[in-house]
Amino acid sequence: MSNEISRNWPAPAKLNLFLHINGRRADGYHELQTLFQFIDCCDLLDFRVTQTPELILHSDMSAVVADSDNLILRAAKSLQQATGYPGGAEIWLEKRLPMGGGLGGGSSDAATTLVALNQLWNTQLSNDELATIGLKLGADIPVFIRGFAAFAEGVGERLQAVTPTEFWYLVIAPDAHVSTAAVFQDPLLPRNTPKLGIDTLMSQPWANDCQDLVVSKYPQVAKALGWLLEYAPSRMTGTGACVFGEFSSQQQALAALAKLPSDMQGFVAKGMNISPLIVRLNHP
C-alpha cells in the first residue's frame, strides 16, 4: 500500500445568506429555512492511508481538542465502522478558518474527511450514504458533502440546489465566541417566522433571525456589523460571530477591507455555488 500523502483537500467555509427559524420541534431541535453558499476560503487537509486501523490527526488545534470530541477523527471512525475498512489514516489539518464563527469550519473539515477517505480508501459509498453518516455528526455536514449551494429545510438536512449570485464578500470575524446552543436556547430568539416557498424567499430581502439577539448580547458583533453596513448590504452568518458584506466586485470588497479599523480582523472571499471540495475531487 502506498505511503504517499494526498495533499490539499479543501474544507471551505459557508455563509448562511439567510436564516429563518420556523419553530421548535418536540425533540428540542429547531425547524429552519436557510440558504447555504460556499466561499473560497478553506481549511486544508492532507491524508496518508495506513495499513493499521489507527487514526492520527496532526494539527495545532489537536492539543486542546479531545480525540473523542474531534469531528475529523469521529468522521473517519464513522466511515471505518460503516464500511468495515481495515486500515486507517494519518491526517494533517492546516486551520485557516476562524473557529466557531458561523462559517462551518468544523463541519466542513469532517465532510472533507469523509469525502477524501471514501476515495482514498476506495470504500465507494455514494454521496447519499456519506451524507447520512455526516448528518449523525452534525446538521451542517451534508451540505458540505454534497458540495452545491443549497436551500435547506428541517434541521438543515433537506437540501435543494440553488444558484444565488456569487458575490464577493468582506467577512469580519469579531473577537467573540458565540455559543450556538445558548442562542437556540434563549427565550428571546424569534421562532415563528412563517415558512415560505423557495421562490418567495429567493426574491425577498434576506435576513438572519439570530442576528438581533446576538447583536444585543455581543458588542463586538454589533460594532462589526454597524461598520460593515456603511459599505454594503451586510448580515450575520449562522449564529455568529462572523458577519459579511456583499460586493459586486473584488476591487470594491478590497477597498472596504483597506479601511477596516485596526481592532477588527477580516478577509475578502468569493462566493461559490460549487464547493472547492467537489472541484478537487473531480480534478485530483
Swiss-Prot record:
What catalytic activity does the UniProt entry give for this protein?
4-CDP-2-C-methyl-D-erythritol + ATP = 4-CDP-2-C-methyl-D-erythritol 2-phosphate + ADP + H(+)
Binding-site residues for ATP, renumbered to this chain: 98-108
Does the keyword section mention ATP-binding? yes
**Entries under Pfam families matching the protein:** GHMP_kinases_C, GHMP_kinases_N
Q: Does the keyword Mitochondrion apply?
A: no
Name the residues annotated as catalytic in the UniProt entry: 14, 140
Single GO molecular function: 4-(cytidine 5'-diphospho)-2-C-methyl-D-erythritol kinase activity
Enzyme Commission no? 2.7.1.148
Keywords of the record: ATP-binding, Isoprene biosynthesis, Kinase, Nucleotide-binding, Transferase
Q: In which pathway does it act?
A: Isoprenoid biosynthesis; isopentenyl diphosphate biosynthesis via DXP pathway; isopentenyl diphosphate from 1-deoxy-D-xylulose 5-phosphate: step 3/6
Q: Which InterPro entries match?
A: GHMP_kinase_C_dom, GHMP_kinase_C_sf, GHMP_kinase_N_dom, IspE, Ribosomal_Su5_D2-typ_SF, Ribsml_uS5_D2-typ_fold_subgr
Name a single GO biological process: isopentenyl diphosphate biosynthetic process, methylerythritol 4-phosphate pathway
Source organism, top-level taxon: Bacteria
The entry's function note states: Catalyzes the phosphorylation of the position 2 hydroxy group of 4-diphosphocytidyl-2C-methyl-D-erythritol.
Give the PANTHER family listed for this entry. Answer: 4-DIPHOSPHOCYTIDYL-2-C-METHYL-D-ERYTHRITOL KINASE, CHLOROPLASTIC
Q: Which family does it belong to?
A: Belongs to the GHMP kinase family. IspE subfamily.
- Protein name per Swiss-Prot or TrEMBL: 4-diphosphocytidyl-2-C-methyl-D-erythritol kinase
Q: Please give the organism.
A: Shewanella sp. (strain MR-7)
Q: What is the lineage of its organism?
A: Bacteria, Pseudomonadati, Pseudomonadota, Gammaproteobacteria, Alteromonadales
